[in-house]
């Protein structure tokens, strides 16, 4: 039974899929080929921009010029886990999430604003990895939908990067880290008990030209009264005695927000 449930806690792949940006290392030939393959199918994905700024009027101007699904947030807290969040990002800043089937870019006048006035996180969804058809069906059946904006809805954006060592592992070695074994509970088995009350979505930042130290963006939502559950989820995932995959993380910080619109 445990084998059946392994890999179910995967949003759009694995929570930790990505190659560190600006590492100064060359990708392997295998990864280059994967990148070429992905490029041909990106148009089928959902693109996202998380745009953060202390200037609410600027954010309003940005949303007026964008098409697609838009949500608005207010940053409540920032928690550095490994490494640090971008300089200037602070409590009280506004954030907009813009999703579209087409690739998203801000108009040039917004991209050239003074450094620190605006911070952009970019990503795109992919199909599920490391999951069988049966596992996907189970995940779809048990996972909850996004929450409505309200004072009771907390959203957390966690940019994450993995070490070069992870990407030097063979594919089967990486996948083994998601499996339940006699020694480890594993990433997906840990998360399975939370999927009914914590919404999650994964955006990849690899291969899309985003010059950033993170490899992908993990996005969560939950009701405020489930805050302790969410923290328990993170604590379990970060416990390398239960989830050895986390030992390959080299960048991780949490942006806690209120979903207001």
Task: Please report, for each region that a protein language model flagged, where it lies by residue.
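Alpha-helical oligomerization segments
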Residues: 201-261
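Short S/T/G/P-rich N-terminal loop/turn motif that feeds into the first structured element of a domain
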Residues: 22-198, 225-228, 260-261
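Intrinsically disordered, low-complexity repeat segments enriched in small/polar residues
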Residues: 6, 13, 24-25
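Bacterial N-terminal signal peptides that target proteins for export
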Residues: 1-7
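Hydrophobic h-region of N-terminal signal peptides that target proteins for export
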Residues: 11-18
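Non-catalytic effector/regulatory segments
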Residues: 2, 198-199
